[in-house]
Amino acid sequence: MIFKERLKEKRGEANLTQAKLAKIAGVSTRTIQNYELGSRKPYQIEVVQKIADALNTTTEYLLGSSGIIVAEAHEKGGAKAARDIDELVSEVTGMFAGGSLSEEALEGAMKALNDAYWIAKEKNKKYTPKKYRKETDTE
């Protein structure tokens, strides 16, 4: 089950309309609609936490392990990092879709990918020309 399905299920159990949930979470009704349609994913962990609280569930349940990794990437590196990690997660999930990989093994693979992404990003900093480096990146 993915985020959009879990969100619909829990919202139905809580007897909340999209508008009421949006008001509680501090987002627009259209945002909740996009989440449920799967055309948008929440990257801000604070929004996911408000939704989870309103639905009496956890962020871990709503997002699943891969969603948490993407949300953490957004917190750590912004929207581009979140998109990169989300793309990696989608590709890896697709590779394992036909096989019999346990949930724990898939979660381990996602964690390893996340770690590898951040290590590569850190090592790549030394190849960035000085004129493009931020003040905090210079050594």
Language-model features, listed with the residues they occupy:
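Helix-turn-helix-like N-terminal two-helix hairpins of bacterial/phage DNA-binding regulators
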Residues: 1-72
